[in-house]
Amino acid sequence: MWKGTLALLTCMQLAGCATPFEKMWQGLATCELDSLHLDSETGRPANPQLAIYTPDKVSDGFAWYKLHEELHGLPIVGFLVPASTFEVHALFVDTPIANARRLTHNAYGSEFADEQLHDEGMAPLLLRDPNNPKRSIIDCTRGESAEPLPEESFPE
């Protein structure tokens, strides 16, 4: 038992070894998350790692997921992905924006604050959660329509 745990911990520390959640979000820094969505016709995940998770709800073209995962040091409590043709992905980070900036800088070398790159769909934008000041949102919006995040708050 302890050997398996030790092997897992060793693997997690090596550069090439990532959790399924980290693999799923590996394109976050450049918002290259094309396979991270539900198929609009079948409702099935297009990404094998996404298939591990069950959406809490699917509404208005988005699939909402609640969970407790860590993404390169960021405490993630949920995410949303498209369940239609929208190109909006969001991670809900369980820490205030000042701490989230520090954590994203440590993990990605960026505070995800470049609005121009975000508007071009080339980088995420770190936002203060308007519904919960103790949380932050990492927003990746791509595509010509530049769809905004849904007005609905993240389900508690």
Regions found by a protein language model. Name each.
Residues 1-15:
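Sec-dependent bacterial lipoprotein signal peptides
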Residues 15, 35, 142-145:
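Extracellular/secretory pathway and lumenal proteins
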Residues 17-69:
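N-terminal export/targeting and maturation segments
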Residues 53-56, 80-81, 124-130:
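Short, exposed beta-strand/loop patches in secreted or surface proteins that constitute
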Residues 62, 67-122:
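Long, charged/polar, surface-exposed segments that mediate recognition or autoinhibition
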Residues 97-156:
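Non-cytosolic coordination micro-motifs
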